[in-house]
Amino acid sequence: MSEENKKLTKSELKDLVKRKKKKKIILVSCISAGVILLALIIGLIIWQVTRIKPVKRTDEQGIVVGKIGEYEIYNDEFSYLLDIYKKNIEYKYGKIDWSDGSEFTKKCLDELEEDIIDGMMTNYAVFEVCKDHGIDADSREINKLVNEKIKEIIDDENGEFKGDKGKYVEYSRKGNESDAYIRIIAKAAVLEEKIIEKLRESGEIEYVLEKNLPEFITHAKESDTFVRTTHVFYPKFDVKGVDIEEVRAEASEIAANLKSISDDEDRYDAINKAISKCPYNTPGYTMANKDGIYFTEGMMGEVYESTARALDEYGTSDVIETDEGFYVIMRLPLDTDYVGKNAETLLENYSWAKLALLERGAKAELLSVCDDFSGLIYERLTK
């Protein structure tokens, strides 16, 4: 098996780190800029059954290349994200001559820098939220939980390494997938759980399953906290060979057709037919189904959320563009029976959406104190 085929995606890593969580929130284009494909391999040493000693960065991995606020960005993290996002952009647009100085290449460089910075800020935004809420990110308890998560990943019989510490150590010292970077990601995952606990204790998350679920159900049914939608989705580059302009044109045709239908029921039937016919509306590409999507602020991308809230019931949007693709959205009325039957899931999503909003705000603050990485990106791409 090739080295490339051995790599885990960042989403797979987070699934492993968080697999005991009951988090069911779906993020389309927020935070993560949705989400988006990052590959990652984990390196560590298991010195004892219950104690895992970190693997030190190599000299090359440990070079500081910049800062985001107080957080030093090391060469391993920067180089890894540069490589992953460069591949994503070239998968989207085709092979790029990064030194040709064209307007197209400048646009791609800007997009690449934005993606890299967003990727770097994702974990540090969690640390900032911790500081704002009095959580010690470096406490013995947190470090113990991080060790447990990493050990769980290492010992996974279905994973790549299956407890082979030598294999972990060797891989963590090659390239840019260092143990230190993995620990940052694992710590962020652990801390998100702690932040949710703190928000519930403080009342910032006002509804708690064990205390006031009935009140939450009433709130969800009678307020505009939750919005229900369905949509047609066309990806930009998740399917090999997709022509972006062709996809945009197809989505625009659907949007225009829906807007030409005056009857609500006929329009609803039409979007469902469009969803069923769209080759990309498989479970891997869309969340749209007969129940629709129930979301509150912080769960979806900002563009998606604001567009949906501006629609009347059974109204449809123009084509909206996000990092991952094109959407045509229809707003649907809330189904109170659905809310009652799925209240626990909606409450869990509501709680995580509160955290997502805090992280979104922390990212905005970090962006204002972020170093300019454009020169370094260009240098690495053209050397």
Predicted regions: what is each one?
Residues 76, 107-124, 136-140, 181-190, ...:
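Soluble non-cytosolic domains of exported or imported proteins
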Residues 18-26, 72, 80, 248-259, ...:
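Solvent-exposed loop/turn and edge beta-strand elements of beta-rich ligand-binding domains
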Residues 156, 289, 322:
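Acidic surface patches and DE-rich sequence motifs
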Residues 2-32, 41-60, 168-246, 298-383:
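PPIase-associated folding chaperone regions across multiple families
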